[in-house]
Curated annotation (Swiss-Prot):
Homotetramer. The reaction produces a racemic mixture of D-glycero-alpha-D-manno-heptose 7-phosphate and D-glycero-beta-D-manno-heptose 7-phosphate. Signal peptide: none annotated. It comes from Shewanella oneidensis (strain ATCC 700550 / JCM 31522 / CIP 106686 / LMG 19005 / NCIMB 14063 / MR-1). Pathway: Carbohydrate biosynthesis; D-glycero-D-manno-heptose 7-phosphate biosynthesis; D-glycero-alpha-D-manno-heptose 7-phosphate and D-glycero-beta-D-manno-heptose 7-phosphate from sedoheptulose 7-phosphate: step 1/1. This is Phosphoheptose isomerase. It comes from the Bacteria. Its cofactor is Zn(2+). Binds 1 zinc ion per subunit. It is found in: Cytoplasm. Its main location: cytoplasm.
Length: 197
C-alpha cells in the first residue's frame, strides 16, 4: 500500500513535468483571451461533470472572490451549481442539455466558455461548446487523453489545453494547476503587483 501511494505521487510529479513542457503557451494564450474578455466587459462561463464540475466551480470562485491578491470581483459563472435548473433541464429535455440551455440564455458574443472534460467526450460539455459557438463565444477547452470530440469543435480563435496523460486522476490534478495558472495570469495582468509582495 505504501508503495502504491508513493507511485501515485511519482506519476503525478511526472505528469506535471510533462505538462510544464507541453502547456505553457496554450495556458498563456488562454489567460490573455480571458483578460481581453474581462476588459471588454464580458464574462467567463465554466462547465464540467463530477470532478470537472468542481474545477469549474473552483475557477469561478477564484475569479468572483479572489485568488492570491486583493482585487475587485471578476465575472465568472459555473454552470454546475444551480440544482433546480440542472434537474429541470435534465428531466424535461436531456442531461446533455444542462449546460447548453444555460449558455443560450446567458452567453453573449465576447464571452468565454471554459469547457472541462478529462476525456474530451462529455456529451453535455460538447453541447455546451456548440451553444457557445452559436452565441459567438470563444472556447477554452481543458482536456486530456487524445482531446476527444471536443478537440474537433475548436477553431483557430479557440484554445485547447490538453494534459499529456491518459490517466483521469493525473489529468484532474493538472487541470487544477492549470486553473491556478490561469487565475494567477489574469490577476497579474489586470492588477500588476510589486514582485516584492
Amino acid at each position: 500500500m505504501l508503495e502504491r501511494i508513493k507511485d501515485s505521487f511519482t506519476e503525478s510529479i511526472q505528469t506535471k513535468i510533462d505538462a510544464a513542457e507541453a502547456l505553457p503557451e496554450s495556458i498563456a494564450k488562454a489567460a490573455e483571451m480571458m483578460v481581453q474578455c474581462l476588459l471588454g466587459g464580458n464574462k467567463i462561463l465554466a462547465c464540467g461533470n463530477g470532478g470537472s464540475a468542481g474545477d469549474a466551480q473552483h475557477f469561478s470562485a477564484e475569479l468572483l472572490n479572489r485568488y492570491e491578491i486583493e482585487r475587485p470581483p471578476l465575472p465568472a459563472i459555473a454552470l454546475s451549481t444551480d440544482t433546480s435548473t440542472i434537474t429541470a433541464i435534465a428531466n424535461d429535455y436531456s442531461y446533455d442539455e444542462i449546460f447548453s440551455k444555460q449558455i443560450l440564455a446567458l452567453g453573449q458574443p465576447g464571452d468565454i466558455l471554459l469547457a472541462i472534460s478529462t476525456s474530451g467526450n462529455s456529451g453535455n460539455v460538447i453541447k455546451a461548446m456548440e451553444a457557445a459557438l452559436s452565441r459567438d463565444m470563444t472556447i477554452v477547452a481543458l482536456t486530456g487523453k487524445d482531446g476527444g470530440a471536443m478537440a474537433g469543435l475548436l477553431s483557430v480563435g479557440d484554445v485547447e489545453i490538453r494534459v499529456p496523460s491518459n490517466v483521469t486522476a493525473r489529468i484532474q490534478e493538472v487541470h487544477l494547476l492549470v486553473i491556478h495558472c490561469l487565475c494567477d495570469n489574469i490577476d497579474r495582468t489586470l492588477f500588476p503587483q510589486d514582485e516584492q509582495q
